[in-house]
Curated annotation (Swiss-Prot):
Keywords: 4Fe-4S, Electron transport, Iron, Iron-sulfur, Metal-binding, Molybdenum, Nitrate assimilation, Oxidoreductase, Periplasm, Signal, Transport. The gene is napA. SUPFAM superfamilies: ADC-like, Formate dehydrogenase/DMSO reductase, domains 1-3. Substrate binds at residue 794. GO terms for biological process: cellular respiration; Mo-molybdopterin cofactor biosynthetic process; nitrate assimilation. Its main location: periplasm. The keyword Iron-sulfur applies. Predicted to be exported by the Tat system. The position of the signal peptide cleavage has not been experimentally proven. Catalytic subunit of the periplasmic nitrate reductase complex NapAB. Receives electrons from NapB and catalyzes the reduction of nitrate to nitrite. It catalyses: 2 Fe(II)-[cytochrome] + nitrate + 2 H(+) = 2 Fe(III)-[cytochrome] + nitrite + H2O. This is Periplasmic nitrate reductase. PROSITE patterns: 4FE4S_MOW_BIS_MGD, MOLYBDOPTERIN_PROK_1, TAT.
């Protein structure tokens, strides 16, 4: 068989990757090389994390049969991580759901019944009855949706329109609340706009990398490979890694720092103090582009109001702040001396000084990276604000090789959850439901009556659990997420509400997850390239893909489910008379007609698709649904610093980083010469703020919501491992990944194990104040906790570690702290 150079590279990429991963090379190589001409290739972003790697997807006879890194993708440059190479297999698990399943007994729905196959019409019949009953009896606040940072952009947009405009309920929130909400609030407080100002191109231009609570070696391995290349090829590049336990990223670290949980706040303030004391402030930048404010303190822990910690808080949930002088700020951080910081954190003084010197050195270009260690934190917003302080004091921001960078964990936590605005308080392009002007903009664009979108913030993720338990939220639809496994405090706050006979729970998913099996109705869902989609990654890169195969059986995309279900409701059934009177022409119309089959959305014909191009939703409806929704959504950000390119441009490109102005993407925001919104002569402009200045916040250390004591004497931290993604609902169906890490283990220091008469491989009961799980003792391996802390991944459905965790949240972002609670161990 004769191959072009390009085809030869494609074919061999899989073989090379398989060899690097230690897989059986001949079979993989033959599958690609031997059948090259028979396989159809097309591009897509990876289905997993927020890095946004580009892959080439090979299809044959209606199935995805191969996958390789896309050599033209600027993010990963042809390389995949181990999960990326097995993308085809996530779609073909033996237990893939192919038809709706309803709990039934004696031929009808029963909360205690067995899951029984039904048709889509029957599923929508039951859903329609439950939604209409709840809306009639209790109103819009009795229904809710929990969505996903894995939704495509138009799925999230369609869901937000259906709930906020159609059902008039802001009780829609994404699972990104559990991972990125603190980053969002941190960005908004400091800069007035969400998402990083830099991009991945910084990696090759930086002199120093500082990881705050980020194990990039396992969670963002492709970016880590680029950092590793930079570090090993340049002796002047430095890597510092901070964590509460030792992990694989420490292998590259020049300065590996293990600190006491929660004390990262102390370290951040110490570095600010060091910068000031050593006259390392960039005075020109600081004087022109920065304001100083002192934030409210003693703000509580996002627990129920009846909890003692909430009762004791002086300013529960307060986001207030007041202006302060530089002298006052200097005095504030002066308290965080080297001696005090070393004592509070357990970090040796020399390591602290080395870290501070990186930021203080005017000749060092520094990037700060962080993920869940910062965000899943009862003071996660503060941690985000405090790291911005370091970059604003030194002016190391919005320039190549310099800047703070919040990494995302889901493929479209940025593009869908944040940019589209699927949070309970947000609207597209950083607008919010509490702002009348913002609501008015959306209502006019959507051609719905003024006053349709509620001004009240809806229920966030943890509040949804509590409302279900309390019987206030009665119909609940979750999509593309597995919150029964991933959310905190399963026993006390989630399971009771899901199984409450007053409530009806719908789960849309490709597989029978823990969440699906706890639901009342399961809807089978199309996944990844079984639909046309778009994701937005951590560097503001929006990427599109085409539908490449059809979903099995009766599985349907989340977009199809939302749009088709909207046909079941007429405006009179969901809107009060005073709204209908404002737009009488909408009487008698379905929500489908009002929200989706509008002149604005339906104006792009199906004929724009290639004749052989799959697009199940658009061909069924008779118009190019995805293009119509995207162009309507993109209107909100254009001209406002969130500019997205025209729809068709994304199918041609390997992603574009917004703002995209006059066909050109933006690598670095807020700086002259890089950002089209910064005029000549302005230098820097943080245009999310009215005065164009960013904010440095004075924020102190405050303790964790729960710490070890005499009985529960260990910290528990939870997280992920390289081989599995989140709850493992996809990766555990890949035999190779499952074999590589078949079950969760409890990583523990050997001396802590010895003190409890535990040995490696022993079964151990892990107990918190909320529940218990049985796990396996691991005293070796990739994760090495210090004495006093244990670490456990949450991918294993047989070991629900979130039975143990506390539902404490950051009071500002409402994001859960999965990194800190107290446990004890009992030998089994």
């Amino acid at each position: 068989m004769k191959l072009s150079r390009r085809s030869f590279m494609k074919a061999n990429a899989v073989a090379a990757a398989a060899a690097a991963a230690g897989l059986s090379v001949p079979g993989v190589a033959r599958a690609v090389v031997g059948q090259q001409e028979a396989i159809k290739w097309d591009k897509a972003p990876c289905r997993f994390c927020g890095t946004g790697c580009g892959v080439l997807v090979g299809t044959q006879q209606g199935r995805v049969v191969a996958c390789q890194g896309d050599p033209d993708a600027p993010v990963n440059r042809g390389l995949n991580c181990i999960k990326g190479y097995f993308l085809p297999k996530i779609m073909y698990g033996k237990d893939r759901l192919t038809q709706p399943l309803l709990r039934m007994k004696n031929g009808k729905y029963d909360k205690e019944g067995e899951f029984t196959p039904i048709t889509w019409d029957q599923a929508f019949d039951v859903m329609e009855e439950k939604f209409k009953t709840a809306l009639k009896e209790k109103g819009p606040e009795s229904i809710g949706m929990f969505g996903s940072g894995q939704w495509t952009i138009w799925e999230g947009y369609a869901a937000s329109k259906l709930f906020k405009a159609g059902f008039r309920s802001n009780n829609i929130d994404p699972n990104a609340r559990h991972c990125m909400a603190s980053a969002v609030v941190g960005f908004m407080r400091t800069f007035g706009m969400d998402e990083p100002m830099g991009c991945y191109d910084d990696i090759e231009q930086a002199d120093a990398f500082v990881l705050w609570g980020a194990n990039m070696a396992e969670m963002h391995p492709i970016l880590w490979s680029r950092i590793t290349n930079s570090r090993l090829s340049n002796q002047n590049v430095t890597v510092a890694v901070l964590s509460t336990y030792q992990h694989r990223s420490f292998e590259l670290a020049d300065n590996g720092i293990i600190f006491t949980p929660q004390s990262d706040l102390v370290i951040l303030n110490y570095i600010a103090n060091y910068i000031i004391q050593n006259n390392a402030i960039n005075q020109d930048f600081f004087s022109k582009h920065v304001n100083l404010r002192k934030g409210a303190t003693d703000i509580g822990y996002g627990l129920r109001p009846t909890h003692p910690l909430e009762k004791a808080a002086k300013n529960p949930g307060s986001d207030a702040s007041e202006p302060m002088s530089f002298e006052d700020y200097k005095a504030f951080v002066a308290e965080y001396t080297l001696e005090k910081t070393a004592e509070m954190t357990g970090v040796p003084k020399d390591q602290l000084e080395q870290l501070a010197q990186l930021y203080a050195d005017p000749n060092k270009k520094v990037i700060s990276y962080w993920t869940m260690g910062f965000n899943q934190h009862t003071r996660g917003v503060w941690a985000n604000n405090l790291v911005y302080n370091l970059h604003l004091l030194t002016g190391k921001i919005s320039q190549p090789g310099c800047g703070p960078f919040s990494l995302t964990g889901q493929p479209s936590a940025c593009g869908t959850a944040r940019e589209v605005g699927t949070f309970a308080h947000r609207l597209p392009a950083d607008m919010v439901v509490t702002n009348e002007k913002h609501r008015d903009i959306c209502e006019k664009k959507w051609n719905i009556p003024s006053g349709t979108i509620p001004a009240k913030i809806g229920l966030h993720a943890v509040a949804q659990d509590r409302a279900l338990k309390d019987g206030k939220l009665n119909v609940y639809w979750t999509m593309c997420t597995n919150n029964m496994q991933a959310g905190p405090n399963i026993n006390e706050e989630r399971m009771p509400g899901w199984r409450d006979p007053r409530n009806f729970i719908i789960v849309s998913d490709p597989y029978p997850t823990v969440s699906a099996l706890a639901a009342d109705l399961i809807l089978p869902t199309a996944m990844w390239v079984e639909k046309e989609g778009a994701y937005g990654n951590a560097e503001r890169r929006t990427q599109f893909w085409r539908q490449q195969v059809q979903a099995p059986g009766e599985a349907k995309s989340d977009l199809w489910q939302l749009v088709q279900f909207s046909r079941r409701f007429k405006t009179e059934e969901v809107w009060p008379e005073e709204l209908l009177a404002k737009k009488p022409e909408l009487r008698g119309k379905t929500l489908y007609e009002v929200l989706y089959a509008t002149p604005e959305v339906s104006k792009f014909p199906v004929s724009e698709l290639a004749e052989d191009q799959l697009n199940d939703e658009s061909r069924e409806l008779g118009f190019y649904l995805q293009k119509g929704l995207f162009e309507e959504y993109a209107w909100f950000g254009r001209g406002h610093g969130h500019d997205l390119a025209p729809f068709d441009d994304y199918h041609k490109a390997r992603g574009l980083r917004w703002p995209v102005v006059n066909g050109k993407e933006t690598q670095w925001r807020y700086s002259e010469g890089n950002d089209p919104y910064v005029k000549a002569g302005e230098g820097y402009k943080f245009y999310g703020k009215p005065d164009g200045k960013a904010v440095i916040f004075a924020l102190p250390f405050e303790p964790a919501a729960e710490a070890p004591d005499e009985e529960y004497d260990l910290w528990l931290s939870t997280g992920r491992v390289l081989e599995h993604w989140h709850t493992g609902s996809m990766t555990r169906r890949v035999p190779e990944l499952h074999r590589a890490f078949p079950e969760a283990v409890l990583f523990i220091h050997p001396l802590d194990a010895k003190a409890r008469d535990l040995r490696r491989g022993d079964k151990v009961k892990v107990v918190s104040r909320r529940g218990e799980v049985i796990s396996i003792v691991e005293t070796r391996g990739r994760n090495r906790p210090p004495q006093g802390l244990v670490y456990m991944p949450f991918f294993d459905a047989a070991q629900l570690v979130n039975k143990l965790t506390l539902d404490a949240t950051d009071p500002l972002s409402k994001e859960t702290d999965f990194k800190k609670c107290a446990v004890k161990l009992e030998k089994v």
